[in-house]
Swiss-Prot record:
Topological category with respect to the lipid bilayer: Peripheral membrane protein
Short name of one Pfam family: Complex1_30kDa
Annotated organism of origin: Xanthomonas campestris pv. campestris (strain ATCC 33913 / DSM 3586 / NCPPB 528 / LMG 568 / P 25)
Enzyme Commission number(s) from the entry: 7.1.1.-
Protein name: NADH-quinone oxidoreductase subunit C
Keyword Membrane attached: yes
PROSITE patterns for the chain: COMPLEX1_30K (PS00542)
Amino acid sequence: MAEQASSFTDRLAARFAGAQISVVQPRGEVTLEVAAAQWHATCLALRDELGFEQLSDLCGVDYLGYGSDEWDTADVSSQGFSRGVEGKALGRFAWGEFPSQESSNGAQPQQLPTQRFAVVAQLISYQHNQRLRVRCYAPDEQVPVVASLTDIWPGVNWFEREAFDLFGIVFDGHPDLRRILTDYGFVGHPFRKDFPLIGNVEVRYDDERKRVVYEPVTSVEPRVGVPRVIRDDARYETAAGEVGKSETAK
């Protein structure tokens, strides 16, 4: 039987003093947030002491622009989302430009978060029938570095390579940290929020050179098709209300 989230978080708090622990209700998801300096030691203790023998997934996260929306209109607009096409929000800019994060109405650039890049690992304990999410933030956003977990869970090898390829997160101690998804000579890291949505280069076949060539993007104009909108998901509120009703009925 799965351990209740409350008792499980108590054990985590007792073992990892000073770590930030959160529980998402009503799903009962537990997240353990640790400092980058304690990332490797914490994961080792989770495997050896708390029985998390499998790492099912690891990914990078870029929190640049997190929590900000591009369309905060409360009422229906007859003009649609025309404002976003003029602005240079995250990812919506052309070759050679840098995202100013300035909206079309002249708003000041948004302050970048102090902790931009994070690494998130999903762990499973079969003996305790428990799942855990572990997260740490890279201290330096210019060169994000965290310790590799390949000596704890060897299967994380390609997950870390993927996070390096897509986000540029360096995993210290990785035995073979190189790109895994992008092409040879690829410039940048495509899952970063400041990476242009239209890309940096385009590919075409050159008849004179008789080969494929890479050139700066010139045939695609950046535009907004879908605005970034923050909404409250009523599904979770409904689920929480149903749980409350069932507890009251008991």
